[in-house]
Amino acid sequence: MKPIVKYQGGKTKELKRIVPLLPEYTRMVEPFAGGAAVAFNQEKDMWLNDINTSLINLYRVVASDMYYDLQGAIAPLYSMEHDDLSREFYEARDVINNSCVDGVLWAKSYIVVRQLCYSGMERYNSSGAFNVPFGHYKKFACYLSQGHHDLLSGATVTLSSAVDVINDSVEGDFLFIDPPYMDR
């Protein structure tokens, strides 16, 4: 299964090299989950953690019954053309930048900005606002599926420090530790 959203530093293209190296394990733990390409590929019990509140909100919405509302909210995007997608992108970016409390709207907006931003970038200005422009896509694409809902509904999803997650892991866990590259 592919990740729900594009994510900088994602491991989808490296899976053919990573998967053969994975040991036997009970649960995949990703302290720096990001797009969680490795965990979604394995389709096993997982613990996803990140400090990105929008990303963790998305995973929590998908894990819950709100998943069905989210699917309904993004469905119209698949038939939109460039100009409508551009409008949706900037509206979604405003939602992300204004601390939305509606979990489904926030999750939809995060999917929109991740899938339609320029070059898949995630960048914030000095005020903490997401400031990547629209990527001029002609069509919307997203891999959100019932499989993601089923997998995440049994997963542990946390917004915590990676150190806490590593310290709280137990025997049988496999920790896939791929920290972000902050100084590039």
Identify the role of each PLM range:
Residues 1-13, 21, 66-184:
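SAM-dependent nucleic-acid methyltransferase catalytic core
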Residues 10, 21-80:
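Conserved S-adenosyl-L-methionine
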